[in-house]
Amino acid sequence: MAVNDPIADMLTRIRNASEARHATTVVPASRLARSIAEVLKREGFIADFEESGEGVQRHLVLSLKYKGKNQQPIIKALKRVSKPGLRVYSNRRDLPRVLGGIGIAIISTSQGIMTDRDARRQGVGGEVLCYVW
């Protein structure tokens, strides 16, 4: 089945696997998905990711992180902001702060995919893809 919004699909797969306490989840591979996974890993929301498969069958295997003996998910929520039907852009002065800096906004800029903090530091704006906290 064709997916109209691969970013929302990726976020939903992560959210569902995290709520079900799965150790890993599989998402279709793309450069954008890989970039988002790199940001999530760098910010400590996922443990690791690896690419597997060949050609059209490529996918990313994301290792999720949990804390405590009750295995509470590190990712509390993921929210898609810019959607195919309504794109949301932000200039460098109006970049959003998620929960006062506790969470992150993932931004697609001319310099690549990065967090709101990195975009502010580099002085660039872009499309606000999602919030993670």
Curated annotation (Swiss-Prot):
Q: Name one Pfam family in it.
A: Ribosomal_S8
Q: Which domain of life is it from?
A: Bacteria
Q: Which Gene3D superfamilies does this UniProt record tie to the protein?
A: 3.30.1370.30, 3.30.1490.10
What biological-process terms (Gene Ontology) are attached?
Answer: translation
InterPro entries tied to this protein: Ribosomal_uS8, Ribosomal_uS8_CS, Ribosomal_uS8_sf
Question: Listed GO molecular functions?
Answer: rRNA binding; structural constituent of ribosome
Answer whether the UniProt record assigns the keyword Secreted to this protein.
Answer: no
Functional description taken from the UniProt entry = One of the primary rRNA binding proteins, it binds directly to 16S rRNA central domain where it helps coordinate assembly of the platform of the 30S subunit.
The family annotation for this protein states: Belongs to the universal ribosomal protein uS8 family.
Assembly information from the UniProt record: Part of the 30S ribosomal subunit. Contacts proteins S5 and S12.
Quote the NCBIfam families the UniProt record gives. PRK00136.1
Protein name per its UniProtKB record: Small ribosomal subunit protein uS8
| Lineage start | Bacteria, Bacillati, Cyanobacteriota, Cyanophyceae, Synechococcales
